[in-house]
């Protein structure tokens, strides 16, 4: 057909005998330089005629209803242009449909295409897509929609090849709107295209508001470019209103594609008025831009959202009351100057939103929530859902840990409701609650142990505490690793409460102290924050420290780490109590030593400090022992009061605990102090912490009480629950991914060569050799 028309048209004839349309279009352009300026309007309007052609009306009854009036006006306005353009249009019509086999279209539609083709000439990518006919093929609407699509292709393809690719199938359709929904919109677009006159009418700000308000936010952001097109095609006065309207549209939040149909329908309904024709046009542009929006939205969630408010608008609370206020519209940075009318401006709009529009950090979350829920990206409850998701994920960890530890989901209950801002506090609170529960558990167990077993099982209970202490410390570390400040602050209070019995217990028996030390174990972190308290003990200990100042300063450190305040109270109380009951103190020392390598430090410190807090009892022993003075009597009373057995236990504990502490802090101090103090029991060998623990474990095993064992088991179970939970999560992940990889070796591995041979033969017989090879190779 191109050749036939070429004969008719000298321009085409001269350009190319072949049906290639690109050169033809370029030639046509030259004859109609004036047409190029109006090409956009003519394209939009000419397609309108197309639509109104009875043969082409198939899917556009609405368009026809709206079309006649604007068409007449448009004809009147563009009669000159049309007169000049009519000839090239026929060849264009023939040329375009010819590749698609749509040549049937009447001549006038071809004419309408001519101006569009002029636009296309500039866009080789658009021409390629048109020639391939993919855009039309993708849509079932037929040539008329294809024309609209072509226009869209022309406008959109200026942007990028990606856009062109997107155009082929989805460019013309809003990414999420069904094609059938788009048809009314396209019809409205055609009605719009008829003439600038109706557009001028529709561009009145009131009218735009009226149009916008019914569809409300439903208009897709893609409407922005459409308004710019309207601006381009309308009178100057209308342009100002259009710019305002475009601002409003820019302001309007992105709406789900499903909302578009409302706008389209409304446009169709108003297309008779001609006022909505502009909106339909806008939507026609949106069709192109919608696609881009969808792709970009998927790839760059945060960039395309014009502003946080629009994104939030889907949420019930954030719904923008009215897009009408122009001030708001102008607040939103318009990607392109409102006055620009070229498609380049539209492209800019599509591209710039990525850069200019304030990226929505929350949008990715919103879309994640949407994807998770399988809802369209603009589902209303997106933001709330996200917090729930993430909170649930975090809570899952916390809840599993908490439930495994506590068997109660109390802390998680508070967290799920908390917004993102509250998550951090919620985590802290959860940890604090966990710690509190563990402390209560320990307190109950320890109190039971202290009440029934501490006195009889001085060594045993202390050993139990020694073994349990690392567990407690590990738990406290795992739970409080992130929250030494907050967690420890709470712990010290609890420990102080639990520690109070400790000072009281020293009076009753030296062993209760081990129980408090077990709790002081957490204070280690807390004590670290409060080294000052040990300093007073140092001052108190100054008497003792004088002989062993180096040992004590480090013990002070250890005290600070192990028990800042509690040691002070216990030490001060010990000053009172230990003095009366020096043997009790040695036992506490044992208990402390056994309770924790660090607590042994504290115990050692307390031993040092206990002497310090109890300068009368221990300063004597320490200094005298070092000095060889009355120190032995001090320790001796202990030995006597404590009984030789406690002394031996103390030997072990002190040997194990004190030397380790000393080894940690000051080996010299340990040797001095222990050499001075322990000649009574036995010269305690200075042992490393490792050595300390094994003896403690051995002794503890020998002396453990059933309740102590139960407590130990519970503590271990708590720790194991945490580890098991993490491991379980890892296992789940591994299982998930491994299960996802079904590809395994051949389903049938034939060890029998005869069977394999037969299989190969079968494959060759019944299956192409190419496919047989993979089957044959087991």
Swiss-Prot record:
Compartments where found: Cytoplasm
Modification Phosphoserine occurs at: 16, 98, 170, 324, 334, 344, 362, 376
Tissues/organs with expression: Strong expression at implantation sites. Was exclusively localized to the apical side of the syncytiotrophoblast. Also found in macrophages.
Bias type Polar residues, positions: 235-244
Annotated function: Could be involved with bystin and trophinin in a cell adhesion molecule complex that mediates an initial attachment of the blastocyst to uterine epithelial cells at the time of the embryo implantation.
Protein name as catalogued: Tastin
Feature: compositional bias, Pro residues: 513-523, 612-622
Region (4 X 33 AA approximate tandem repeats): 516-647
Keyword terms, alphabetized: Cell adhesion, Cytoplasm, Phosphoprotein, Repeat
Lineage of the species this protein comes from: Eukaryota, Metazoa, Chordata, Craniata, Vertebrata
Comp. bias intervals (Basic and acidic residues): 1-11, 560-574
Span list, region Disordered: 1-115, 212-244, 406-425, 508-587, 600-641
Oligomeric form and interacting partners: Directly binds bystin, and indirectly trophinin.
BP-aspect Gene Ontology terms: cell adhesion
Organism for this UniProt entry: Homo sapiens
Cellular component per GO, a single term: cytoplasm
Phosphothreonine PTM sites in chain numbering: 363
Sequence repeat coordinates: 516-548, 549-581, 582-614, 615-647
């Amino acid at each position: 057909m191109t050749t036939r028309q070429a004969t008719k048209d000298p321009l085409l004839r001269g350009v190319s005998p072949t049906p290639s349309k690109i050169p033809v279009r370029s030639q046509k352009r030259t004859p109609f330089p004036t047409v190029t300026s109006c090409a956009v309007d003519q394209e939009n309007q000419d397609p309108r005629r197309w639509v109104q052609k009875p043969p082409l009306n198939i899917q556009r009854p609405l368009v026809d209803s709206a079309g006649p009036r604007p068409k007449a006006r448009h004809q009147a306005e563009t009669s000159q242009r049309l007169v000049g353009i009519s000839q090239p249009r026929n060849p264009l019509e023939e040329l375009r449909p010819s590749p698609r086999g749509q040549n049937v279209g009447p001549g006038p539609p071809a004419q309408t295409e001519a101006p569009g083709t002029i636009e296309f000439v500039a866009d080789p990518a658009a021409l390629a897509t048109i020639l391939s006919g993919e855009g039309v093929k993708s849509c079932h609407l037929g040539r008329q929609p294809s024309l609209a699509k072509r226009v869209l292709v022309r406008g959109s393809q200026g942007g990028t090849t990606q856009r062109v690719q997107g155009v082929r199938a989805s460019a013309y359709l809003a990414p999420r709107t069904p094609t059938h929904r788009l048809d009314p919109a396209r019809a409205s677009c055609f009605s719009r295209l008829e003439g600038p006159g109706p557009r001028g009418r529709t561009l009145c700000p009131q009218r735009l508001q009226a149009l916008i308000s019914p569809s409300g936010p439903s208009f897709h952001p893609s409407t922005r470019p459409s308004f710019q097109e309207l601006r381009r095609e309308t009178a100057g006065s209308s342009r100002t209103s259009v710019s305002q309207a475009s601002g409003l549209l820019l302001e309007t939040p992105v709406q789900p594609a499903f909302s578009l149909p409302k706008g389209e329908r409304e446009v169709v309904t108003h297309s008779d008025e001609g006022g909505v024709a502009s909106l339909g046009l806008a939507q026609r542009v949106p069709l192109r831009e919608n696609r881009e929006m969808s792709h970009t939205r998927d790839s760059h969630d945060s960039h395309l959202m014009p502003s946080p408010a629009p994104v939030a608008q889907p949420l019930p609370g954030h719904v923008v009351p009215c897009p009408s206020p122009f001030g708001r519209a102008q607040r939103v940075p318009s990607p392109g100057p409102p006055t620009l009318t070229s498609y380049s401006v539209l492209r800019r709009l599509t591209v710039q939103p990525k850069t200019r529009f304030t990226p929505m950090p929350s949008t990715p979350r919103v879309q994640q929530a949407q994807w998770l829920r399988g809802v369209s990206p603009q589902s209303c409850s997106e933001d709330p859902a996200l917090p729930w998701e993430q909170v649930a994920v975090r809570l899952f960890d916390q809840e599993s840990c908490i439930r495994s530890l506590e068997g109660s989901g109390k802390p998680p209950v508070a967290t799920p409701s908390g917004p993102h801002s509250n998550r951090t506090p919620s985590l802290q609170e959860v940890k604090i609650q966990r710690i509190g529960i563990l402390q209560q558990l320990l307190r109950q167990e320890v109190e039971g142990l202290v009440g029934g077993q501490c006195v009889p099982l001085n060594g045993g209970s202390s050993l139990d505490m020694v073994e349990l202490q690392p567990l407690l410390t590990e738990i406290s570390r795992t739970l409080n690793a992130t929250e030494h400040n907050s967690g420890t602050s709470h712990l010290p209070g609890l420990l102080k409460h639990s520690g109070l019995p400790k000072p009281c217990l020293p009076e009753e028996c030296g062993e209760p102290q081990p129980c408090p030390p077990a709790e002081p174990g957490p204070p280690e972190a807390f004590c670290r924050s409060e080294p000052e308290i040990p300093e007073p003990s140092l001052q108190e200990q100054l008497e003792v420290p004088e002989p062993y100042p180096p040992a004590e300063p480090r013990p002070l450190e250890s005290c600070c780490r192990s028990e800042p305040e509690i040691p002070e109270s216990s030490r001060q109380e010990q000053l009172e109590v230990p003095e009366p009951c020096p043997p009790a103190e040695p036992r506490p020392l044992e208990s402390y030593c056994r309770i924790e390598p660090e607590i042994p430090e504290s115990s050692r410190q307390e031993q040092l400090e206990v002497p310090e807090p109890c300068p009368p009892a221990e300063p004597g022993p320490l200094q005298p022992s070092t000095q060889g003075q009355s120190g032995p009597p001090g320790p001796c009373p202990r030995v006597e009061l404590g009984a030789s057995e406690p002394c031996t236990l103390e030997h072990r504990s002190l040997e194990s605990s004190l030397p380790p502490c000393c080894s940690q802090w000051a080996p010299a101090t340990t040797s001095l102090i222990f050499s001075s103090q322990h000649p009574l029991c036995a010269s305690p060998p200075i042992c490393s912490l490792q050595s300390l623990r094994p003896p403690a474990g051995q002794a503890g095993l020998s002396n453990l009480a059933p309740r102590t064992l139960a407590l130990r088991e519970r503590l271990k179970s708590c720790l194991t629950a945490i580890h098991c939970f993490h491991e379980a999560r890892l296992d789940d992940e591994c299982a998930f991914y491994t299960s996802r990889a079904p590809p395994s070796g051949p389903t049938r591995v034939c060890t029998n060569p005869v069977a394999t041979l037969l299989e190969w033969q079968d494959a060759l017989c019944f299956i192409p050799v190419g496919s047989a090879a993979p089957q044959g190779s087991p």
